[in-house]
Amino acid sequence: MPVKFLIYIPQLIFGGAEKVLVSFANELVFRGHEVEVLELYEKGYLKPQFDARVTFDAICSRAYTEKYYASLAQVKKNPMLLGKLVFSKLVGYRKFAEKLAAKRYAAREYDVAINYLEIESPEFLLNYVKANKYIQWYHTDIANLDNPESSDVMRQAWKRMNAVICVSKDGKNHFIQRYPELAEKTHLIYNFFNQNAILEASEVPYEFPGEHPVLLSVGRMTVPKQYLRFLNVLARLRDEGFEFSWHVLGEGAQRQEIEEKIRILHLEERVFLHGVTDNPYKYMKACDLFVLPSGWEGFPTVTVEAKILGCPVLATDVAGIREQLRHGETGWIVENDETAIYKGLKYLLQNPELCRKLCINEGMEEVCKNEEKYIRFYKLCSIKE
């Protein structure tokens, strides 16, 4: 019996959670269900990767979204009165757009409504969308947030949800520690991955510019990824005579800072910023070592994808990483500080044969295979097939 899902997300950009949403939605329609994706701010970058049967809607149009982010950037650069007035007007338009969307959705009904990212409140779904079940997906680890109190404002809304799904054991445990009253409705389901699509996309030939061994990182240029810290590590190893190049896929608010630090450290011939790509997998397959230097994660999806492609992985000890890798066997896990990253990377550069052994992809069945995740998810939805 087909089930009708509405999945609410702030925007479809090139992020880890957004990419696994593609796999999740495609898995549902593959099994005969209806899926509609609702963006708060229309971006739609990932739309071509969804199954053609997935439908889309947006609360705030693409034209408004572009004006909103342009105005936000101007306010950050020059917070003068005029900029604030323009920005506040655009925020007012969002409220108006939500009222229009509420009228539109009053005539629609769904079996399950999902708030797919914890950074956006589920209030719109709870107040304006008719559904039999409401589910909150929680992709981060609240213990690593600089300001976990910012999540507390959603506490009452989460109490109204039928279930909360966390994507790592650490994430679930820390969520329950902060919100013990939600323990009974909080569950662990790993992200969905389309292994066949990842393997197929990786077959596109690619050769990296620069020195070998090639180090690769994939992720937005934001503070949690700690790319500035990793540049210090690379400069130190360069000064010690090690050969390598580091390639980064992604964009973000820290790009300018990263570019400036590359110049200051004279790493222009060692570090390559490729920007956003719709196919990171051809890069992953061609790299010598995949590096996750993050300060914190909820459950890093890029390391799962790298292991699916047989990449050796060096990763900081963030939430979820020990659910993916066995240190010294299927990956190399280091403490989450600059010195540990330096020592770990230096050791692997000195022992390339160990890197090759770390290509082994074992012990990730629970993380990678979708069947068990699907069964647990439908049990939460109380859907019988």
Set out the residue ranges of the language-model regions:
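Nucleotide-activated donor-binding/catalytic signature segment of Leloir-type glycosyltransferases, i.e.
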Residues: 259-275
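Short acidic/histidine- and often glycine-rich active-site loop of Leloir-type glycosyltransferases
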Residues: 301-305, 318-328, 332-333
